[in-house]
Amino acid sequence: MAEKAVTIRTRKFMTNRLLSRKQFVIDVLHPGRANVSKAELKEKLARMYEVKDPNAIFVFKFRTHFGGGKSSGFGLIYDTVESAKKFEPKYRLIRNGLDTKIEKSRKQIKERKNRAKKIRGVKKTKAGDAKKK
């Protein structure tokens, strides 16, 4: 793939001490080129913000503007990978390779659903979890 110039701008930058991260909106200018990969963005952000571990960087919700050449999304840089594992949703951890997805069999899903059908109200969630172990 041809390495064309890519410009990364961050705006609405804020440090969130409560969640021990930096959060911002990313604007990527990539004229004459298809979308920039998230791995490449993480690598460039790690160099920009001098992050030791690129696994602590999360980029998501990218939308390409009409006509191409510009994309916008969100970025999070956690202080440590441990804090990222603590605060990030599981699906984002799986996408970034920090967690593994548990594949449930079709039969397990159906059995759990049928157990839950027999019970009403608040006890429904407990019934699904009890037999799961």
UniProtKB/Swiss-Prot annotation:
Residues 109-125 have a biased composition (Basic residues). It holds the Pfam family Ribosomal_S24e. Coiled coil: none annotated. Gene3D superfamilies: 3.30.70.3370. SUPFAM superfamilies: Ribosomal proteins S24e, L23 and L15e. It comes from the Eukaryota. Belongs to the eukaryotic ribosomal protein eS24 family. This is Small ribosomal subunit protein eS24z.
